[in-house]
Regions:
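Electropositive, intrinsically flexible nucleic-acid-contacting patches
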Residues: 1-209
Length: 209
């Protein structure tokens, strides 16, 4: 969310997500081609290159370029992407996200919205102005993108904000626990606009005894 690139930001986030998806998840290294990125995002290769440069300049990617000569194809440029590891403040995506063919700006915007949801939920308890300030886009841009997401069935307004309805996010911490008390605790926190605490086995053992 702190990645500041103006109105190109959602597109850059989408490109980053596809590079991450096409990487080795243990090494965070990707050899995906610009041609493949273009195919997967619907963006032309020139736009892909510009996006990669912004991601590189912002420190989200390290790019190593090699050029090899091929007898039939001439000189071939190939990038290797080293993705900066993220150890905190992350969420999981279902692979179905990458198969839905959303426009890149919508795909990236959806990820930005998820990043400001209450922990382990698809709920945003902010106004459009607050969302714009948090994400770093203009209010008019946020309004237009939210409208487009609503038309695609990816988000719906609720009494105090918005609910993501895309169905491609995995709220793992809640799903991994069967403790009714923990779920009730999370729901209570969310109703009060408070971020639920992380699952703590020792603390829950006290509550459950």
């Amino acid at each position: 969310v702190n990645f500041q690139t103006g109105n190109s930001k959602p597109v850059d986030v989408s490109v980053w997500a596809v590079i991450k998806c096409c990487s080795n998840h243990k090494t965070n290294i990707s050899h995906v081609t610009e041609e493949k990125l273009s195919l997967l995002t619907g963006l032309d290769e020139r736009t892909i290159r510009r996006s990669i440069k912004r991601l590189k300049d912002a420190g989200y990617l390290t790019v190593q370029t090699t050029i090899k000569e091929d007898a039939d194809r001439g000189f071939i440029k190939r990038n290797t992407y080293y993705i900066a590891p993220i150890k905190t403040n992350y969420f999981f995506l279902d692979n179905s996200y990458f198969k839905r063919n959303y426009p890149a700006k919508i795909a990236g915007f959806l990820l930005l919205l998820k990043a400001i949801c209450l922990n382990n939920t698809d709920t945003i308890q902010w106004s459009i102005s607050q969302i714009a300030k948090s994400i770093g886009l203009s209010r008019n841009t946020i309004t237009a993108l939210i409208k487009e997401c609503q038309q695609l069935g990816l988000i719906k307004p609720i009494s105090n904000g918005y609910e993501l309805t895309a169905g491609c996010f995995i709220n793992s911490s809640v799903k991994k626990t069967n403790a009714g008390i923990y779920k009730e605790l999370c729901e209570f926190c969310q109703s009060k606009g408070v971020t639920p605490p992380n699952w703590d086995k020792r603390a829950m053992s006290v509550l459950l005894t």
